[in-house]
């Protein structure tokens, strides 16, 4: 049975309104006031776009980042890669966004990265860029063909924080997600390194 949705007060921003970000933001917009920002023009069905990262950060208490983390074409999944050297994703876009978000943030802001990164990357390369705001890693387990449905009906929600505690930022995210979910998913909280 679907829950009746109602707009809550927590303002939200989605930075990166591509295939993943737009569909997730449209689901969030059924429950929360939300704005989106993307370098490419978008036309979402139920939320407004802003013209800058600064406007997105100023609007929101929770800022989601859904930026691409491209990988080497040899690792696209078409062929086995066990014989190839290990290669990481390219985090340039995410790093640029975090640096800009940091300029306009303070400790009242929770920045949530949903982009794909390898274990250890958040602590080693990304979180140090965000000195003014709080940070959580929250990768989505979503199939690209059914993003909106998968987002509202997850099997589990994964949240990574500095210490892996289920209090503080993790609790804030759990409370944020509950009114949007059409099911009762399992919430798995760990550190950024897990």
Protein language model annotation of sequence segments:
Residues 1-58:
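NAD(P)+-binding Rossmann beta1-loop-alpha1 motif at the extreme N-terminus of oxidoreductases
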Residues 5, 104, 124-138, 142-143, ...:
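Internal alpha-helical scaffold of NAD(P)-dependent oxidoreductase catalytic cores
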Residues 9-10, 109, 155:
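Nucleotide donor/acceptor-binding cores
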Residues 58-59, 153:
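Alpha-helix C-terminal capping/helix-to-coil transition sites in glycosyltransferase folds
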Residues 63-64:
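N-terminal Rossmann-like NAD(P) cofactor-binding module of classical short-chain dehydrogenase/reductase
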Residues 67-68:
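Conserved NAD(P)H cofactor-binding loop of Rossmann-fold oxidoreductase domains
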Residues 71-147:
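Rossmann-like NAD(P)(H) cofactor-binding subdomain of soluble oxidoreductases
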């Amino acid at each position: 049975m679907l829950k009746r949705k109602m707009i809550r007060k927590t303002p939200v921003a989605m930075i990166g309104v591509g295939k993943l970000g737009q569909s997730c933001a449209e689901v969030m917009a059924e429950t929360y006031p939300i704005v989106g920002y993307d370098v490419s023009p978008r036309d979402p069905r139920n939320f407004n776009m802003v013209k800058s990262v600064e406007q997105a950060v100023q609007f929101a208490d929770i800022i989601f980042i859904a930026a691409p983390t491209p990988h080497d074409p040899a690792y696209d999944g078409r062929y086995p890669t066990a014989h190839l050297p290990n290669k990481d994703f390219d985090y340039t876009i995410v790093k640029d966004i975090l640096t800009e978000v940091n300029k306009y943030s303070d400790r009242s802001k929770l920045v949530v990265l949903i982009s794909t990164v390898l274990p250890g990357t958040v602590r080693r390369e990304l979180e140090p860029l965000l000195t003014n705001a709080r940070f959580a890693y929250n990768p989505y387990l979503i199939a690209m063909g059914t993003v909106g449905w998968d987002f509202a009906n997850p099997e589990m929600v994964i949240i990574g924080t500095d210490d892996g505690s289920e209090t503080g930022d993790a609790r804030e995210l759990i409370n944020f997600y509950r009114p949007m979910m059409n099911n009762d998913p399992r919430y798995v909280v760990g550190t950024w390194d897990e």
